[in-house]
Amino acid sequence: MLENRVKTKQIFIGGVAIGGDAPISTQSMTFSKTADIESTKNQIDRLKLAGADLVRVAVSNEKDALALKELKKVSPLPLIADIHFHYKFALIAAQSVDAIRINPGNIGSKDKIKAVVDACKEKNIPIRIGVNAGSLEKQFDQKYGPTPKGMVESALYNAKLLEDLDFTNFKISLKASDVMRTIEAYRMLRPLVIYPFHLGVTEAGNLFSSSIKSAMALGGLLMEGIGDTMRVSITGELENEIKVARAILRHSGRLKEGINWISCPTCGRIEANLVDMASKVEKRLSHIKTPLDISVMGCVVNALGEAKHADMAIAFGNRSGLIIKEGKVIHKLAEKDLFETFVIEVENLAKEREKSLKD
């Protein structure tokens, strides 16, 4: 685990700590109409199962705002209300949810922000100042354009507004739709404030595009010690947002959990359908939370050398293969027996590691 994380002021969204020494939390956003409580609850359940820590819901009208009271009763995750344009919806939402997200570029005047702050103070819930490059307030957009400087100036201005109202229970996000502006904005603001950061690349695209952008922007920031909570925005399935986010946390050294998958690129030496087999192995063992390095190799030639540092490896040969544990061959089996035996061995190793951690 990396030890260079910037220590920020700690806030709480429900029972989830954000900032300070707290683990970096992941979140996503439902796409149902929030007033459709059954559909929204089903999506929140899916996110909970995927490993999300928090969930955000859109509040587009008064019906959505009023539905939050009932939704909060059944939500297994802390609930964040996402408010644009209509500050009065935030006043209603604050009575029920665990946090409010506002976009200072469209929420309105200082008086409206004060009303939202007062409502959040009363319920002791935090606010996210959600700055987006594409919707900056007029004075910052005209002066700086949709630049990192414009985003930072907007964030500082709004942070000062909240501080002047004696309110410091907030976090900040600075989102753009590309990697470089996102990184530069967070880097620029980090030394200037003590508040926790919500990381994200907005409108990042489909699974492929978003995974690349988010890994570069969020992963880069996390390795610099920047970031306290995060969302990977994907045009696609909810669960993928959490899956990719947790993978970024693992590979940036911020989360020691789950399997680190190692598999060779295909070449003329492979003796099996490696693409299908690697996918099959990963899917079958996706439930394991124990930190393990697991290798899936397409030939014995590579496996004996390249997989020797893995906790467990499988190597496919001509109608047979090897299972290697901590650098030593423990099974040579016919192809038909290889997969199930490998799964059992990995699950047993995970249990051994968990037991040793408890003893």
Swiss-Prot record:
Pathway(s) it belongs to: Isoprenoid biosynthesis; isopentenyl diphosphate biosynthesis via DXP pathway; isopentenyl diphosphate from 1-deoxy-D-xylulose 5-phosphate: step 5/6
Keyword Heme among UniProt keywords: no
A Pfam cross-reference name: GcpE
Positions contributing to [4Fe-4S] cluster binding: 264, 267, 299, 306
Catalytic activity: (2E)-4-hydroxy-3-methylbut-2-enyl diphosphate + oxidized [flavodoxin] + H2O + 2 H(+) = 2-C-methyl-D-erythritol 2,4-cyclic diphosphate + reduced [flavodoxin]
Gene3D superfamilies reported for this sequence: Dihydropteroate synthase-like, Sulfite Reductase Hemoprotein, domain 1
GO molecular function: 4 iron, 4 sulfur cluster binding; 4-hydroxy-3-methylbut-2-en-1-yl diphosphate synthase activity (ferredoxin); 4-hydroxy-3-methylbut-2-enyl-diphosphate synthase activity (flavodoxin); iron ion binding
Tagged with keyword Nucleotide-binding: no
Cofactor: [4Fe-4S] cluster
EC number: 1.17.7.3
Record's cofactor remark: Binds 1 [4Fe-4S] cluster.
BP-aspect Gene Ontology terms: isopentenyl diphosphate biosynthetic process, methylerythritol 4-phosphate pathway; terpenoid biosynthetic process
Keywords, comma-separated and alphabetical: 4Fe-4S, Iron, Iron-sulfur, Isoprene biosynthesis, Metal-binding, Oxidoreductase
Family recorded in the similarity comment: Belongs to the IspG family.
Summary of the function given for this chain in its UniProt record: Converts 2C-methyl-D-erythritol 2,4-cyclodiphosphate (ME-2,4cPP) into 1-hydroxy-2-methyl-2-(E)-butenyl 4-diphosphate.
Listed PANTHER family: 4-HYDROXY-3-METHYLBUT-2-EN-1-YL DIPHOSPHATE SYNTHASE, 4-HYDROXY-3-METHYLBUT-2-EN-1-YL DIPHOSPHATE SYNTHASE (FERREDOXIN), CHLOROPLASTIC
Name of the protein in its database record: 4-hydroxy-3-methylbut-2-en-1-yl diphosphate synthase (flavodoxin)
Lineage, broadest ranks: Bacteria, Pseudomonadati, Campylobacterota, Epsilonproteobacteria, Campylobacterales
